[in-house]
Amino acid sequence: MPPDFWERCFWLWGLLLWLSVGSTGDAPPTPQTNCTDFQNANLLRGTNLKVQFLLFTPLDPSCGQLVEESSDIQNSGFNATLGTKLVIHGFRALGTKPSWIDRFIDALLRAADANVIAVDWVYGSTAAYFSAVENVIKLGLEISRFLRKLLALGVSESSIHIIGISLGAHVGGMVGHFYNGQLGQITGLDPAGPEYTRASLEERLDPGDALFVEAIHTDTDNLGIRIPVGHVDYFINGGQDQPGCPTSIYAGYSYLICDHMRAVHLYISALENSCPLVAFPCTNYKDFLAGQCLDCFNPFLLSCPRIGLVEQGGVKIEPLPKEVKVYLLTTSMAPYCVHHSLVEFHLQEPRNKDTCITVTFLSSSVTSSVKITIPRHQRVGKGVLAHPSPQCQINQVKLKLQASHRVWKKDQTTIIGRFCTAPLPVNDNKKMVCLPEPVNLQASETVSHDLKITCI
């Protein structure tokens, strides 16, 4: 965690305290008859746990039915033959309803024929973060008691899917721990880092908490946890500094929260859109960008994990491996998904210095670039290039040899080599497409070539 993390938190906490005076944040929609909305807690009196379980069903997706007792559940639209998804929010600094929750619930109900239960613990998650942390075990016990009522109605443990956001991810882990890891699935959306990075397995989310546990990491250098906590752990853009998020503290609250909340918006986008958010296992982000991890054979036997409501994230092996780090790149806005391509340049002759080449793909309206380096005394340099359009819709590739920094004269270096590319995953060489002729590159000059790849 950066040394200035708490300093930034306290600075922004003062801003939040000032904003909270006379403010309730996002105005909640006018509730329908017999519908219940999230509570709004007072910022200075929000530490007492006061939980609501709000049921949303395909028959009435915009109406939250308050279900507390078994009779409430039986008299509601709850269908015990369907799967059940519990959504647990995290720390609420201002004591308001999460601004994203309505869209999240709607996306879940559109994507799956299921019961959706939102766990409202705005009371108990407000004011000091550390007070909210102290409520995690108590909340986990309350949710466990509630699930017992569902199980009594014939719901199976394996049909329960908990989706926890930030601190809510560890609440979900606590519930799963109470059920000895027999719940169907837990999805952690940027599980909280403060107070949990060094916590024991019993205190935080871990692979033993459900039959399948996945986590999406987007803010590992601030509010999110930096260690793997699931069977599959997605590190989006390396797990930090998400494209499109502010990089200056002067952006205020958005600077603190944007990376952290990107996990939520990514998951919503995966539910709402058909373009896949596919990831690739790798030891670390640097190796992934360098084109060292091109398929999903190890450890997934070619079944690449995918974000969304896909059984076991698309992983089709048993037993499931644990704490596997997988990586993917995204765009700066919804639907976020990109296509990943391996790009390679093969020198005819090795050089006694590093060779840097910028590779740019051009489609009808978008350009995407990456720099690859060929180490000295070697012939091949490669990297991963992310682009919104499928590779078969790329019209041109541009190549530019980066000039050496010479003050006294122009760099007139010329190299000759072969350019090749293939869409990920690269399971064999059959996908590799190379330009038909060797390419001559002169320092600082851009060379363009048509790229003709057939859509399959």
Swiss-Prot record:
Enzyme class name: hydrolase
Pfam families assigned: Lipase
Catalytic center residues: 166, 190, 260
Localization terms from the record: Secreted
Gene Ontology biological process terms, A to Z: lipid catabolic process
Listed GO MF terms: phospholipase A1 activity
Reactions it catalyzes: a 1,2-diacyl-sn-glycero-3-phospho-L-serine + H2O = a 2-acyl-sn-glycero-3-phospho-L-serine + a fatty acid + H(+); 1,2-di-(9Z)-octadecenoyl-sn-glycero-3-phospho-L-serine + H2O = 2-(9Z-octadecenoyl)-sn-glycero-3-phospho-L-serine + (9Z)-octadecenoate + H(+); 1-hexadecanoyl-2-(5Z,8Z,11Z,14Z-eicosatetraenoyl)-sn-glycero-3-phospho-L-serine + H2O = 2-(5Z,8Z,11Z,14Z)-eicosatetraenoyl-sn-glycero-3-phospho-L-serine + hexadecanoate + H(+); a 1-acyl-sn-glycero-3-phospho-L-serine + H2O = sn-glycero-3-phospho-L-serine + a fatty acid + H(+)
Glycosylation: residue positions: 34
Recorded family membership: Belongs to the AB hydrolase superfamily. Lipase family.
Function text: Hydrolyzes the ester bond of the acyl group attached at the sn-1 position of phosphatidylserines (phospholipase A1 activity) and 1-acyl-2-lysophosphatidylserines (lysophospholipase activity) in the pathway of phosphatidylserines acyl chain remodeling. Cleaves phosphatidylserines exposed on the outer leaflet of the plasma membrane of apoptotic cells producing 2-acyl-1-lysophosphatidylserines, which in turn enhance mast cell activation and histamine production.
UniProt cross-references to InterPro entries, sorted A to Z: AB_hydrolase_fold, Lipase, Lipase_LIPH, Lipase_N, TAG_lipase
CDD domains: Pancreat_lipase_like (cd00707)
Gene Ontology CC entries for this record: extracellular space
Descriptive protein name: Phospholipase A1 member A
Domain of life: Eukaryota
S-S bridge residues: 245-258, 282-293, 296-304
Annotated signal peptide: 1-25
Catalytic activity, EC: 3.1.1.111
Listed PANTHER family: LIPASE, PHOSPHOLIPASE A1 MEMBER A
Alphabetic keyword roster: Disulfide bond, Glycoprotein, Hydrolase, Lipid degradation, Lipid metabolism, Secreted, Signal
